[in-house]
Amino acid sequence: MKKLLKSALLSAAFAGSVGSLQALPVGNPSDPSLLIDGTIWEGAAGDPCDPCATWCDAISLRAGFYGDYVFDRILKIDAPKTFSMGAKPTGSATANYTTAVDRPNPAYNKHLYDAEWFTNAGFIALNIWDRFDVFCTLGASNGYVKGNSAAFNLVGLFGVKGTSVNANELPNVSLSNGVIELYTDTTFAWSVGARGALWECGCATLGAEFQYAQSKPKVEELNVICNVSQFSLNKPKGYKGVAFPLPTDAGVVTAAGTKSATINYHEWQVGASLSYRLNSLVPYIGVQWSRATFDADNIRIAQPKLPTAILNLTAWNPSLLGSATAVSSSDQFSDFMQIVSCQINKFKSRKACGVTVGATLVDADKWSLTAEARLINERAAHISGQFRF
């Protein structure tokens, strides 16, 4: 049985190291009991059933580095089934689009192409009886998200009638033939959690953990890549809780009422894992359930706009004549995309359950180094080093 358990754990660790990497690290279930001697103070093996034991024997501190690198979080859009905008254009005649209608939301349940999240932090743990840890991390995170333009509700107005774009005109075209990507700045991040070695039998340990993490970065760069409307914004600002039509100065540098695009990241996780100690090496395998959300309050960000029309252009978008042979003289703004905007919808986990494999290297029962890979619900790697005081 022992040989079988050793083989299973070593095989899992090897498979995780060469397979695809993936929420929050599960960690080694043996962590609370691996470092039994202190670097500064000598460790005390306290027995909770000993009437002479004191809290000084029961409590110890560990500290170290915590690095978590999510290369591809599997996310989807959390948006309603309908989206309010102008009616879909039909035929060849221009028109005014001033009445809102509920249309099928192209962002509903849309999957993102890529989502990355990187965290570097300091780690401190309060250990009780060499069995339970209560820990926190303080550090910094930054991220990257990429998806189809439909996932960000990229919309615009095309085929508008008249010699001006009225303030009550609504976008009438959903643009799904593009890609939108955003980069966040590096900002403060923190997490708290608990981990316990619940059952031990010889060199095997079964444990469980719980964690919560939070960060609130701002969008540093927004790139919209679409053949009819392409733009890039540094530190973009937009409108929160504002329905269409957007203000007439939307997209102008001096626009009023805009707010910074900020993403509120939350994540909960519970996990269980099994480890087996082989001298200084402690491989482990585990499962975790996590739920992550990235919420930007559905902020709407407008394409940069010229304060006044230049050569009948309100933005630097290409003309789309289609089968027409000349630009209309009566409908001056009908042949290129107007009042383009995108919306940063709420993202959430598409898959909740994942598998974790990893190993811890222990030195003199005072120092340890852990490497971990997470699979299925994300591709991520984790590395941490810690010592006991």
UniProtKB/Swiss-Prot annotation:
Family: Belongs to the chlamydial porin (CP) (TC 1.B.2) family.
Cysteine-cysteine disulfides: none
One GO location term (cellular component): pore complex
Membrane topology listed for this record: Multi-pass membrane protein
Locations listed in the record: Cell outer membrane
Functional note: In elementary bodies (EBs, the infectious stage, which is able to survive outside the host cell) provides the structural integrity of the outer envelope through disulfide cross-links with the small cysteine-rich protein and the large cysteine-rich periplasmic protein. It has been described in publications as the Sarkosyl-insoluble COMC (Chlamydia outer membrane complex), and serves as the functional equivalent of peptidoglycan. Permits diffusion of specific solutes through the outer membrane.
Record key words, sorted: Cell outer membrane, Cell shape, Disulfide bond, Ion transport, Membrane, Porin, Signal, Transmembrane, Transmembrane beta strand, Transport
Signal peptide boundaries: 1-23
GO BP term, example: regulation of cell shape
Entry keyword Ubl conjugation: no
Name of the featured protein: Major outer membrane porin
Binding partners and assembly: Part of a disulfide cross-linked outer membrane complex (COMC) composed of the major outer membrane porin (MOMP), the small cysteine-rich protein (OmcA) and the large cysteine-rich periplasmic protein (OmcB).
Organism: Chlamydia pneumoniae
InterPro entries: Major_OMP_Chlamydia
Molecular functions (GO terms): porin activity; structural molecule activity
Pfam (any one): Chlam_OMP
Gene name in the database record: ompA
